[in-house]
Amino acid sequence: DKAVTLKKIQKFSNEYKDRKCKLYVLHGTMKESELTGLYKHPKIKALINISHGEGFGLPVFEAAYNSLPVVASNWGGVTDFMNAPAKNKKGKMKKRPHFANVDYDVKPIQKEAVWEPVLVEDSMWCFPREVSYKKAIRSVYKSYGQHLSKAKKLAPQLVERLSEENQYKLFADHVYDGEDLKDVEYVFVSDMFANE
């Protein structure tokens, strides 16, 4: 996997001899502290995600959680956490993207991407528009302070709303309402469904 990936990146990068940026390949399992170190590194200014779609989008979440500006499409799993309340011009709170939003089209996945039963033939994907993502990246570069401010406003909301404790509670509340479980030390799953 690593050798194939490096070969593809080398071939791709050779097409751009006059590029001004370096390419670094991170491969393999990283510790949480190493990931956080990347997101907090002073030379890392944003996470760019122009994928076809994510489930939850863990790298995007981790970047946002660490107050790193994000460039992404407002589609797929990122909509669960990258849109947060903000005041509009009239002073009302409304959910707004807290990232550099990329325009996109939703189209059927390519035939070569079909992977039954995971990606079925009639699945749809997000296709970010090149002009839009270039514009979004440029915006983050030129107006970095504005994008960093949005990221810093979003991070504490993520920490509060998506903390482990809140997620455990949300999950447990969906599984069982807990009314009959007050002051009980042990609960057996079979007891939850005894009347069904």
What are these regions (language model features)?
Residues 2-38, 45:
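Nucleotide-activated donor-binding/catalytic signature segment of Leloir-type glycosyltransferases, i.e.
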Residues 43-45, 67, 74:
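A short alpha->beta transition loop at the rim of the catalytic pocket in nucleotide-sugar-dependent
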Residues 52:
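Aromatic "clamp/platform" in nucleotide-sugar-dependent glycosyltransferases that forms part
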Residues 57-60:
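Short glycine/serine-rich donor-binding loops of glycosyltransferases
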Residues 63:
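Donor-sugar nucleotide-binding helix/loop cap in glycosyltransferases
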Residues 69-72, 82-83, 89-95, 100-101:
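Short hydrophobic beta-strand element within catalytic cores of glycosyltransferases
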Residues 73-74, 80, 102-104, 108-110:
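Conserved acidic donor-binding loop of glycosyltransferase catalytic domains
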Residues 105-196:
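C-terminal amphipathic helix plus adjacent low-complexity
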